[in-house]
């Protein structure tokens, strides 16, 4: 009911199995069914996009937008925002088993990181979560509390195409009439 039920084509390297790709079918999209881990891409990947000609898509270009959207509860540094609509806090499901896993990784030579979204990305850490006081923060919860005047929400409607006038979206086409 809340998942589109997508699967990959058969994967020859995986005994011809199809891989399930959960995708949310509700306001908030996949943020209603994902693992709620808040982790950004590796800065070098964004910088590679910029080097390939995507001006404005380097890490330093995007970091202000990441920070603007983030409402971190506990992080107070140059990599995080604290006033954004998407609330982020340390994952609450941090058990003794999680702690033992991190200790084992550190004992075997992996670096402990305090923050996966800071400047270093290779290591082991407790993750941040898109939750607030233990409640899932979907993109619908984050961005639709105050619905903008220029936004009309259609539920139980499948969009087949976005209509554009040059670079501006001016409407939609639906399969539901």
Give the positions of each predicted feature.
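Short, intrinsically disordered, charge-balanced linker/junction segments flanking boundaries
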Residues: 167-177
């Amino acid at each position: 009911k809340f998942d589109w039920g997508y699967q990959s084509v058969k994967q020859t390297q995986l005994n011809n199995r199809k891989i399930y790709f959960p995708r949310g079918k509700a306001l908030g999209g996949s943020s209603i069914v994902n693992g709620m881990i808040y982790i950004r891409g590796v800065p070098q990947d964004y910088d590679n996009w910029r080097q390939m000609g995507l001006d404005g898509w380097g890490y330093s270009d995007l970091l202000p937008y990441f920070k603007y959207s983030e409402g971190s509860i506990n992080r107070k540094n140059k990599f995080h925002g604290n006033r954004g609509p998407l609330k982020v806090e340390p994952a609450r499901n941090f058990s003794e088993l999680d702690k033992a896993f991190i200790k084992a990784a550190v004992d075997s030579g992996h670096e402990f990181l305090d923050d996966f979204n800071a400047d270093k990305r290779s290591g082991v850490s407790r993750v941040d979560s898109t939750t607030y006081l233990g409640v899932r923060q979907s993109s619908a919860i984050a961005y639709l509390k105050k619905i903008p005047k220029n936004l009309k929400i259609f539920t139980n409607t499948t969009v087949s195409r976005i209509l554009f006038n040059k670079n501006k979206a001016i409407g939609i086409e639906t399969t539901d009439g």
